[in-house]
Amino acid sequence: MTEDIMATSYPTFLTTPYLPMKLLMNLTNDTEDICVFDEGFKFLLLPVSYSAVFMVGLPLNIAAMWIFIAKMRPWNPTTVYMFNLALSDTLYVLSLPTLVYYYADKNNWPFGEVLCKLVRFLFYANLYSSILFLTCISVHRYRGVCHPITSLRRMNAKHAYVICALVWLSVTLCLVPNLIFVTVSPKVKNTICHDTTRPEDFARYVEYSTAIMCLLFGIPCLIIAGCYGLMTRELMKPIVSGNQQTLPSYKKRSIKTIIFVMIAFAICFMPFHITRTLYYYARLLGIKCYALNVINVTYKVTRPLASANSCIDPILYFLANDRYRRRLIRTVRRRSSVPNRRCMHTNHPQTEPHMTAGPLPVISAEEIPSNGSMVRDENGEGSREHRVEWTDTKEINQMMNRRSTIKRNSTDKNDMKENRHGENYLPYVEVVEKEDYETKRENRKTTEQSSKTNAEQDELQTQIDSRLKRGKWQLSSKKGAAQENEKGHMEPSFEGEGTSTWNLLTPKMYGKKDRLAKNVEEVGYGKEKELQNFPKA
């Protein structure tokens, strides 16, 4: 950090932003043992950049974690890695307000030494855990593309949980010395929270920082580059179709994702580590003051890029994870459809829906709440001792053939379109706003289609009625079946108890006294149930 007193071979001093740069350079030329920095730019750059990362990164990462938890269960290995990556980004973003205050107040830290150590720890913990989780994702995707059979057999979510625990443990152990090095230094007018350490310990800190950089950045960087290079080579292999060689769209999309990840990795992490290493060793070697100033400015500019990784990771989730992309799009569409429906009702309060061709879907018996009998007596009170007879076989058959009707109308549901005002067109409902020529023509087409559909339904209904009249299927109660057979009564009766279950009897298979009612598939799923005897109303 530039707020640290530099541990070079000559004495160095930090300036305030109030001294002009020309005077500082003249002072540097006159005294060879003094190198003066002008760091006024960072008091504007860092607060603004950290504030932007906080305002953008916090909602994005919280939304990502919510989608992972609420919309994407159960998790696969990639989802496990991405959730831990989002958790790491969220913890770091939550620490940024303290740094915004620190740099806006010109290197004044009023929060104490413990919080200073914690904030610096979170920065490097997020930095290196992000790199390691991206490495895990890269290795997992490489195995899935280049070795799909072995990856399915050997890699699952449990293994991913273990790997993530090892990543957190490794990063924490590697950064424990950083908690010891980082400290605060009280000055006359302010208190400095060192990003590195005190000047007398700076040489040892550089050695430690170099080892951590090679272990947690250098090696993962090589692994990521190797995995994505091999994946690109595998995906670039075309598929031979006849005499032509084509590259499928999913392979092109995967290659674009790889390019995006590599560019994001290069922008966020590479410049920061290169300029930081140059800055540390330039201070140790005691190079010329002008060159040291240039390296210092470059290092400060690249620090916001490392923090911006917390905002780029959610974009990576959207591009690299198909499940995340589908869940996010579905959630956004559901949220946006609610105000559209409200606007539709408020903008057209007097319009009445008109039914188009085809019957409406019938609610299944399980969806009807039941508190006893659906039949009411003369006093209007519900009773379990009453029964209603249904003599209209068409209503019964409509219930029995509900699934076939819905399936027949499924093709109409797929033809959903947008009306003139951009609102969703609802199936079987048409809102007439204007009686113009085009509307009348569409109504004529709708009438023709409805007549055809009604004709088909009538033909199907006739066939079912003929079956009922022949006695192939019969609806009746248990004890009343014998009486109905003697009288030749074929009128089906409806059971109004409970969930209004429809019961189907096959009299040829059972005796007159021991008849069982077989539930319709929608309600009973093939289970048999005895009908209870209720007196006819």
Swiss-Prot record:
Alphabetical UniProt keywords: Cell membrane, Disulfide bond, G-protein coupled receptor, Glycoprotein, Membrane, Receptor, Transducer, Transmembrane, Transmembrane helix
Biased composition regions of type Basic and acidic residues, renumbered to the chain: 409-423, 431-447
Extracellular side: 1-49, 101-118, 183-210, 276-292
GO molecular function terms listed in the Swiss-Prot or TrEMBL record: G protein-coupled purinergic nucleotide receptor activity; G protein-coupled UTP receptor activity
UniProt xrefs under InterPro entries: GPCR_Rhodpsn, GPCR_Rhodpsn_7TM, P2Y4
Transmembrane feature ranges: 50-70, 80-100, 119-139, 162-182, 211-231, 255-275, 293-316
Signal peptide: none
One GO CC annotation: plasma membrane
GO terms (BP aspect): G protein-coupled receptor signaling pathway; head development; mesoderm migration involved in gastrulation; transepithelial chloride transport
Biased composition (Polar residues): 448-465
Residues modified by glycosylation: 26, 29
Cysteine pairs bridged by disulfides in the record: 116-193
Entry annotated with the keyword Glycoprotein: yes
Membrane topology of the entry: Multi-pass membrane protein
Glycoprotein found in the keyword field: yes
Compartments where found: Cell membrane
Stretches for region Disordered: 401-505
Topological region Cytoplasmic: 71-79, 140-161, 232-254, 317-537
Function: Receptor for extracellular ATP, UTP, CTP, GTP and ITP. The activity of this receptor is mediated by G proteins which activate a phosphatidylinositol-calcium second messenger system. May play a key role in the early development of neural tissue.
Family: Belongs to the G-protein coupled receptor 1 family.
Listed name of the protein: P2Y purinoceptor 4
Species whose genome carries this gene: Xenopus laevis (African clawed frog)
